[in-house]
């Protein structure tokens, strides 16, 4: 797998546009992965700050937010007990990405909408999140 090599070459490119976004995104993923690996709880305030930064930067630069930022943003807000904001994040994300399975799963977990559950089971039964949450 040459993914780390590709990532390293990308960061070495001095002409990389918006590299700060990519750097912060990978820094965030690394933080989440390492805390999960050692069983340590994450710092939810830090998570919210980083996701807020990535959300705003994405919106400003591309006028659009990537689905993964909605997903991670939702998780960060939930971890920080910002329930109203997390609900808004999922709704906004689903408007932009109505076919996003992770967003649909989180929406189902919040609402227990049976039609959404049926859709997930029928059309995405083998998706890891559908399996993990035993929908």
Regions found by a protein language model. Give the residues of each.
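Short helix-adjacent coil turns
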Residues: 1-2, 81, 112-115
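Alpha-solenoid helical repeat scaffolds
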Residues: 8, 52-55, 91, 118
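Terminal, low-structured helical/coil segments at or just beyond the last alpha-helical repeat
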Residues: 64, 93, 106-135
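Surface-exposed, polar/charged faces of alpha-helical domains
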Residues: 81-84, 88, 95, 99-103
């Amino acid at each position: 797998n040459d993914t780390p090599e590709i990532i390293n070459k990308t960061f070495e490119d001095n002409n990389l546009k918006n590299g700060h976004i990519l750097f912060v995104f990978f820094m965030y993923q690394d933080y989440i992965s390492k805390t999960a690996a050692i069983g340590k709880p994450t710092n939810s305030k830090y998570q919210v700050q980083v996701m807020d930064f990535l959300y705003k930067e994405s919106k400003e630069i591309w006028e659009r937010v990537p689905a993964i930022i909605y997903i991670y943003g939702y998780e960060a807000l939930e971890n920080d007990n910002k329930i109203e904001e997390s609900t808004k994040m999922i709704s906004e994300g689903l408007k932009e990405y109505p076919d996003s399975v992770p967003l649909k799963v989180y929406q189902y977990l919040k609402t227990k909408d049976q039609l959404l559950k049926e859709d997930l089971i029928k059309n995405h039964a083998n998706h890891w999140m559908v399996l993990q949450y035993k929908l």
